[in-house]
Regions:
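Metal-dependent phosphoesterases centered on the DNase I-like endonuclease/exonuclease/phosphatase
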Residues: 16-23, 96-189
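Surface-exposed cleft-lining segments at the edges of enzyme active sites
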Residues: 51, 79-97, 133-138
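Single conserved hydrophobic/aromatic residue that forms the stacking wall/gate
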Residues: 1-7, 11
Length: 190
C-alpha cells in the first residue's frame, strides 16, 4: 500500500528507513526495525517513547490525528520476534509486550479512540499458520505469547482480519528461503 496508488488518509508501515511525500514521522534504525506513520492529515503529539525500551530499538511510534472532530491515537508497532526461545531475545519480547499492554491499559482509560496496528510477530491462533504443531515452541506461537495478544484484545481492541474473516486463512508472511510462498506455508503475524 503506497500513497501514490491509494487514497487512504493514514498509512502505517514497519521496517521503514526513510520518509515519503506525506506528513511523515519515522522512527528507524540503520539496518533493521523501524516504524512510521504517514498521513495526509496533521499529526500531533508524535512520540517514540510511549513504552520504555531498554535496548532502545525503533519499535513503536504514536501520534494523534483528528477525524470528524475526534482525536484518534494511532500506534504503530514492530514487536520483537523473540526467537530463539530460552534466550534473552525471548525475554525481551515478553517484557516488551508486557510494557505495551501496561501502556495500552493506561491509554484506554482516557481514550477510547485508539488504533493499534503493525507487525505483532504473534500467530494468534491455529488457523493463522500452515502447520500449528511445528510452531508450538516458536516465539511467534507459544501459548504465553498468544495469551498476551488476547490480553490486548481484551482491552477493547479488535483483530480486524478475524472480525471480517472468522475462519478464512489469510497469511501475511512466508519464509522466502524455503519456497513457502509456492507451497502456501504461511502465517499471519501482522
Amino acid at each position: 500500500l503506497w500513497p501514490s496508488s491509494a487514497a487512504s488518509d493514514v498509512y502505517k508501515r514497519q521496517d521503514v528507513f526513510s520518509s515519503l511525500d506525506y506528513e511523515s514521522h519515522v522512527h528507524g534504525q540503520k539496518s533493521y526495525n523501524g516504524v512510521a506513520i504517514i498521513s495526509k492529515k496533521k499529526l500531533d503529539n508524535v512520540k517514540t517513547d510511549i513504552i520504555k525500551d531498554k535496548l532502545k530499538q525503533s519499535r513503536i511510534i504514536s501520534a494523534e490525528v483528528e477525524h470528524k472532530k475526534k482525536k484518534i491515537q494511532l500506534i504503530n508497532i514492530y514487536t520483537p520476534n523473540g526467537n530463539p526461545v530460552d534466550t534473552p531475545k525471548y525475554e525481551y519480547k515478553k517484557n516488551w509486550l508486557d510494557d505495551l499492554i501496561k501502556k495500552l491499559k493506561s491509554l484506554s482509560k482516557t481514550n477510547k479512540n485508539i488504533i493499534l496496528a503493525g507487525d505483532f510477530n504473534v500467530i494468534p491462533a491455529a488457523e493463522d499458520v500452515y502447520n500449528p504443531k511445528s510452531f508450538e515452541d516458536d516465539a511467534l506461537y507459544r501459548l504465553e505469547i498468544r495469551k498476551k495478544f488476547r490480553e490486548m484484545l481484551g482491552l477493547g481492541f479488535s483483530d480486524v482480519y478475524r472480525h471480517f474473516n472468522e475462519t478464512k486463512e489469510g497469511y501475511t508472511f512466508w519464509d522466502y528461503m524455503r519456497g513457502a510462498w509456492q507451497k502456501n506455508n504461511g502465517m499471519r503475524i501482522d
